[in-house]
């Protein structure tokens, strides 16, 4: 499969002239950072560009940061796997951004407080301990959230340029990209970020529109709908269709994420706090609602075009991404869009598009690196020193943290093994921070009875969102309600393992109170019925051998005394005497919605039971 992928990426139109275009652009970006270094002399200028960003530059820099290469890649991945049904994510994002622009929900009141970061507001409203804890939760969730950005960006460059898609190439590209981003973010701060964001906004806007037009022209507009209908049916168009992989639960989760992206996520809020006035801020969000939708819909379309191309015009790619043999692992579908573009775009233009995508990559990374390093400096380190740090020291600490965070995302990209779609991974890791942050900002700004104890409890409750990650669920699966405890394996052959047969339990005498409690607790979970044929289909089996090694695999079919899995890894084979436990994975959307409800509950309850002795006004400045 590795050789097949190498052959697939090698058929690119990327040439020497394209490399020249990319290098010239990168040198221009670094040059800008050196030029504006003189203007980054204090923390306000370094972090928020002196709070002097106008409406149209604000729109450009907000779009530049929020439409990074990671956005293009995860949106294309959703289009490739889900078809036109994925459009609902972008449509919802645009609608929510427009409503926030019209109402000023959360962001206007934050701007009126003239804070540099969200945790700084926590201190004004709830006290120093809340600010420090909020900064820790924000940094923890945010760093996990951006952990795969670097690897995904490297995969795009490897796929579109025709490099050998092995770990050496991906890792080398990761190091080079990280070095470039670190140089101009460390040197210039937010001023260089805003200026490069503007340039990248222009290049990326033109590049993504031209690419979309060429992609549709190549595969044919009619073929788009026909192919999606043929292979995906109604699920390729309707996000609430049975087989779409989304559903109403996911749609509701997307509405909340729309609020998060605009009003809670620090990189977007940092742009709001840099605006020259609240009027400019509201205008920024109102107009940016268009880009909030387009930034996902056009990459969705590129992913759909890649799917149509693979299924109709590239049998070699079809064998790579959709192998017929059940025991052959499909290649990561993140490669689909860049390989597709590498084959259809002409030399010269492909260099411009790649430069635009790298621009998007750098735009996101500079904003995120600056944001998280600022949070750690301003909201964790500075409060611990009781504000005794002067501006030069804070800037120096921030620059050191930018480098350390860069090294962390390099490490995380190399070693994280989760199999979630990138968008779903980002939503879950971000929820560690934003589920608690929503309670604190909404309650703190609009509810005068919100207390510091309730705030601390809500922030701590947000950590439960980490259960949405696949590796974490696997580690704690025995604690998930409805799961099946360890069973001893009595026989194995090929992809099937046998154990003692499950029997349907006898009916228990009805108890209205007990039934009500059980129904309430089990509502988010699925109760196992292993005595039925295929009662465990699509569940996950976790096999543990005598050495303590575990392996999780999806169940394809099940009987009362056996399960058949999709495939065993080459280096793992279950034996008689090993144990198997079984659980139903929780979707990221379900975990996210559960965490939102949980954090709001503990915030309200904590505020009512433990009110502050001296209440602060919700609009306190």
Annotate each language-model stretch with its function.
Residues 1-562, 569-621:
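Membrane-embedded helix-loop-helix hairpins and adjacent transmembrane boundary segments
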């Amino acid at each position: 499969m590795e050789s097949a992928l190498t052959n697939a990426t090698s058929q690119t139109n990327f040439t020497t002239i394209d490399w020249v275009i990319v290098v010239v652009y990168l040198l221009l970006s670094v040059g800008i950072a050196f030029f504006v270094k003189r203007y980054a002399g204090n923390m306000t200028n370094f972090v928020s560009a002196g709070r002097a960003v106008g409406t149209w530059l604000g729109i450009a820099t907000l779009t530049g940061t929020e439409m990074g290469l990671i956005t293009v890649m995860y949106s294309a991945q959703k289009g490739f796997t889900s078809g036109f049904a994925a459009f609902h994510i972008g449509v919802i994002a645009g609608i929510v951004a427009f409503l926030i622009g019209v109402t000023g929900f959360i962001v206007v009141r934050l701007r009126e407080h003239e804070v540099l970061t969200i945790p700084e507001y926590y201190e004004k409203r709830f006290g120093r301990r809340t600010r420090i804890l909020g900064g820790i939760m924000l940094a923890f969730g945010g760093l996990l959230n951006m952990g795969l950005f670097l690897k995904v960006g490297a995969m795009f460059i490897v796929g579109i340029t025709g490099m050998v898609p092995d770990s050496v190439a991906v890792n080398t590209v990761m190091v080079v990209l990280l070095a470039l981003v670190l140089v101009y973010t460390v040197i210039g701060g937010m001023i260089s970020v805003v200026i490069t964001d503007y340039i990248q906004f222009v290049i990326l806007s033109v590049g993504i529109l031209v690419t979309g037009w060429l992609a549709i022209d190549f595969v044919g507009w009619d073929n788009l709908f026909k192919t999606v209908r043929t292979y995906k049916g109604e699920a390729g168009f309707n996000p609430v269709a049975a087989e779409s992989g989304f559903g109403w639960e996911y749609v509701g989760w997307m509405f909340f994420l729309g609020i998060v992206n605009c009003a809670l996520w620090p990189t977007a809020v940092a742009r709001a706090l840099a605006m020259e006035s609240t009027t400019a801020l509201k205008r920024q969000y109102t107009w940016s609602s268009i880009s909030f939708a387009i930034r996902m819909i056009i990459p969705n379309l590129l992913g759909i075009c890649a799917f149509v191309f693979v299924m109709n015009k590239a049998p070699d790619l079809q064998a790579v991404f959709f192998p017929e043999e059940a025991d052959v692992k499909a290649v990561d579908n993140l490669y689909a869009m860049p390989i597709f573009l590498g084959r259809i775009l002409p030399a010269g233009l492909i260099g411009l598009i790649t430069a635009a995508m790298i621009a998007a990559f750098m735009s996101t990374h500079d904003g995120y690196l600056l944001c998280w390093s600022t949070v750690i400096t301003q909201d964790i380190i500075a409060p611990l020193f009781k504000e005794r740090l002067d501006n030069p020291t804070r800037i120096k600490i921030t620059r050191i943290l930018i480098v350390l965070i860069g090294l962390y995302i390099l490490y995380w990209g190399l070693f994280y093994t989760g199999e979630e779609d990138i968008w779903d991974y980002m939503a879950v890791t971000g929820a560690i921070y934003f589920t608690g942050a929503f309670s604190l900002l909404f309650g703190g700004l609009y509810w005068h009875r919100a207390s510091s104890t309730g705030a601390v409890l809500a922030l701590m409750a947000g950590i439960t969102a980490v259960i949405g990650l696949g590796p974490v669920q696997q580690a704690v699966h025995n604690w998930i309600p409805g799961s099946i405890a360890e069973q001893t394996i009595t026989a194995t052959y090929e992809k099937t393992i046998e154990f003692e047969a499950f029997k349907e339990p006898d009916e228990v005498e009805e108890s209205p109170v007990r039934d009500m409690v059980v129904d309430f607790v089990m509502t988010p979970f699925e109760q196992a019925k292993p005595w039925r044929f295929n009662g465990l289909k699509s569940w996950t089996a976790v096999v543990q051998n005598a050495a303590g090694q575990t392996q999780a695999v999806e169940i394809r079919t099940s009987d009362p005394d056996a399960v058949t899995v999709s495939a065993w890894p080459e280096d793992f084979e279950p034996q008689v005497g090993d144990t198997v436990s079984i659980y139903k994975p929780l979707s990221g959307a379900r975990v996210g919605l559960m965490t939102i409800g949980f954090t709001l509950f503990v915030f309200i309850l904590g505020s009512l039971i433990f009110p502050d002795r001296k209440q602060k006004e919700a609009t306190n400045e």
